[in-house]
Amino acid sequence: MAQQELELQENFLNKDTEYNQLNNSKSQILNEEIEYQIGKQKIFRLSIAFMTLFTAYGSCTSLISGLYKTLNFTNLGLMSLFSTYFTFAFASFVAKGIIQKFSFRVVFTISNLGYTACIAAGIWVFMCEGSEQSGFCSVEAIYSIVNFTAALCGICASTLWVAQGGYVDILSSTCPSKRGVLIGYFFSFMSASNIIGYILASILLNFFGNMSYFLLNSVLSLVSAYMMYVLPDPYSPNIKSQNDNRNKQQIKPLKEQIKEVLVLLKDKKALYLIPYYWLVGVILGCYASYIFVVVKYSLNEEQVQYAPQYVSYVVIFLGLSGVICGIVVGKLADKYNLLILAIGATLLVTTAIIFSLLGLIVKEYALCFLIAILWGCCDSTNSSLQVIIASKDFPGQLQMFSLQKLANSLGCSFALIMGILLQSYPPYCILFIVFLFQIISTICLAVLLSLKNTENKV
């Protein structure tokens, strides 16, 4: 009888423990779902602000080379982009310290103004159209103003994007099972800026002219600055200690901030990711100027003078493919191995290169749309995955986002320099350079995957 009572008591205690565990599990799932919904709303507001900014700035960067060429400023567009990404690279070292000193919304807003100045420089250039090339309209003055504002934009871009990485990382850390969805959600909105930007560009350039194009984009950029200023704090109200700890952090000297970024190079995981981050930058620098070239090849003599408008039609499809890929990749990233997905994304670059070569041979305008779709997939997929990998493998480490943006911007700068130096060579030369970096990054990702699999077995 006593034994039966003991067994009943044990069964009761076991059931009570199971019941408590079940309740805790349900409570945890419910809390994560609440955090996800809160995070989703904040990501939505951040995404809309970024989408508005890059609706203005994104189309300018792709069309600026062709637009400035119409005024016989042959390399001004590519030089300004190089100035942006070169300063972006080195400003990334100090971005973390600036972000620690100010709130996210202040960093976003001030950084936004650098983009606005860069866009507004286009107004200056086209104000001088038809004027004598002297004084503020001299070639030297125009090159100086455009490159100065481009360099300022690069400095601001470093704080903007490192802050974006930190903001999204904080939100996704409260619901790790939805990390990929949230980051993919952001980049799908970023790709949507291409669609809106180039539709806007095609209307303005066709019916109102270049001056109106830069004026409206400058206004849009200022609107996005206000959106960023009213952004909510990323920290969860349920985890107030996060914000308190952040505010107590001391701002380290510049030398120590640089050391923090460089010390990551001793980490094998970070070291093998650098070629991949470099490739993402090379892709951006390549398609920003290459799509204009491949479209121009497909046009006849009468159509060439309207090349910027034809480019804007094509890049709308680049944005559309980016939106779809951003959503799909975000969902896949929460279910499958990130490194395997990244390897697949680098192989997608090879497909884009093959069709880009075909576009130069066939010289068919319709094929340019498929080429743009492929480059849009490459850009959005790899941009999303690099942030998800950094956020998952290096949680809470802003210096990893600094290293990522450093490699991105150096890769992009390299591609832009090659674009200028290889102008007298056939256009396919730049594609072979991209292919070389694609092979290197794929090999490095495969080695990193092998190392991780070995660690997991041990």
Where in the sequence are the language-model features?
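C-terminal ends and interior cores of transmembrane alpha-helices
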Residues: 113-139, 347-363, 416
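C-terminal transmembrane helical hairpin of 12-TM major facilitator-type secondary transporters
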Residues: 339-382
